[in-house]
Amino acid sequence: MFVVNDLTISTLKGRVLLKDFSMTLNPDDRIALIGEEGNGKSTLLKILAGIDVSSYVTHTGSIFCDEKTAYLPQKIENEWMDETVFGYMVRENHDDEIDYEHYSHYAELYDALKAVNLDASILDDERQLRTYSGGEKVRIAMAKLLYGNPDILLLDEPTNDLDLETLIWLESFISSSSLPMIFISHDESLLENCSNGILHLEQLKRKQEARMTFARLNYSDYVRDRLHFIERNNSIAAKQKAEYFKQIEKYRQIYQKVEHQQATISRQDPHGGQLLKKKMHAVKSLGRKLDEKKENLTERFDPEEAINIFFADVDLNPGKVILDYHLDELTVGERVLARNIELQVRGRDKVCLIGKNGSGKTTLLRMMKDVIMSDDSVHAGYMPQNYDEVMDFDISPVEFLKKEGTREEISRIRTHLGSLKFTAEEMEHDIRELSEGQKCKILLLKLILDGCNVLIMDEPTRNLSPLSNPQVRKMLIEYGGCIVAVSHDRKFIENVCDKVYMLDEDGLHSMM
C-alpha cells in the first residue's frame, strides 16, 4: 500500500509548491506528474521515494508505504560513468563493495536486461557506462531498477535525451508493465499513450498560490476536460463581471441622484428630507451588497502555461535557397559518423533531422548553422540544446534581451516576459537561477524580438511542459520563415515540419 496524506511542500523561502495533497496509489496506476518547470515535480517524486530534500524544501504530512519503491533519476550520476554495467547494476552506492552473492544471481541480471531489450552479454563487457548512448543508459538504469524487484516505480523524466526508437520502446514498457508507477515526462505522445491518471502542479497568481489537480484520466481526456473547464469558467466569469458593472453603474446613478436631491431639498421640507435620508440608507445598503457580490464573483482562470507571444511580419520568398549543403564525411574526432550528406532548404521549408542517439545530428546542425548564419541575406537565429552556448547566465532576462536599453524597449521586454508568466522578481534574477523551461522561453522571445526569418533549433521543445508545447507548435506552424531543427518530439515533427530527414551512416534520407 502506498498512501499520501496531507502532504505540503514549501521552499526554504516560504513559497508553497504543494498543499494538502492526499492520494492512494492503486495497483494498475500509471500516474503522469505534469507542470511547468520549477513547480516541484522532481522534488515531489524524490519525497515520495524517501530521498532527503531538506537542503532546499520543507514538507509536512505523511507517506505510508509498505512496498518497495524504485526511483529513476533524470540522469545517471557522473560518479558512475567509469563503471561497467555489472558494477553499476549490483551496487546501490558507487562507494559500496561488490557483494559476491550477486555473481550467483546472473540469471536475474540477465532477465532484467532482457526486459529492457538489451543484449545480456553487456553484463560481461568491460565498457564504461559513459560509452553508451543516452537511450542505452536509460535502459541500463531501468534494468537496475527491475533487478531490485520493486513493487512501485518512480521515474523522473525517463524520456530525456532519447531517440525515437528508444522513446517507442519506453512507451511500450510503461504501457505493458504490471507495476504501478508515477512518472514525469514532457513527451505528449508518451503521456497520451501511457497515462491513466494525471497529477498536475501549478503556480498561479504570479507564483503566490499553489494549485494541485489530481484526475484519474488519461492525458488526452484531462487536457480536453481542462480546456472545457477553462472556457466555461471564463465565460461565466465574463458574464458575471459584465452584469456586476451594469449594476455598479446603475447604483452610481441612483446614489448621485439621491445625493443631489439631498443637497438641493429645502430646509422647509423636513418630511421630504427624512424620506431622502431613508432612501440614501437603502442605496448604501445596496452598495454593501454589491461589495459582497464582488467578493463572490467567479474568478477568471489564467492558465500558467499560457504563451502569449508570436512572430510578426516574417515572410520569406518560398523559392529562396536558404541552404545548399554537401558534406563528404561527418566526423567526430577520428570517427566517421556519416558520408555523402546532401540537403537543400528553401524559403519556407520547415525541416527536421532525426536519427539515433550518437548519429551526429547536433554536430551536423551546428555545421549547417555556421553556413546559414554566414549569409547576410537572411536573419538567422539559433537555439541550441545547451542554452549557455548563446546565453550569459550571469545577467538578468531583461539585460539579455535588451539592445539599446531605452525606457520604452525595457518596458516592452517586461511586458513580453509578463505574458510568459515571469514575475517582476524573475525578470531581474540571474538567468542561471531560472528553470530550463524559463530559459527556453527567453530564447524564443529573443528570436521573436530579433525578427529572425530563419530558425535553427536543436530540440526546441525538450524543456517545455506538455501544456506549453501546443502553443509553441501553433506559433511555429504560423511562422512565415524557415526552420531547420533536430527533434525527437513526435508532435513537433508531425505538426510543424513538412520535411523530415533521417541521418545514418549513409547520409540523410527523406522520410516525408
Role assignments for model-derived ranges:
Residues 100, 230-336:
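Flexible nucleotide-interacting loop at or near the entrance of a catalytic core
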Residues 1-233, 317-512:
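ABC ATP-binding cassette signature C-motif
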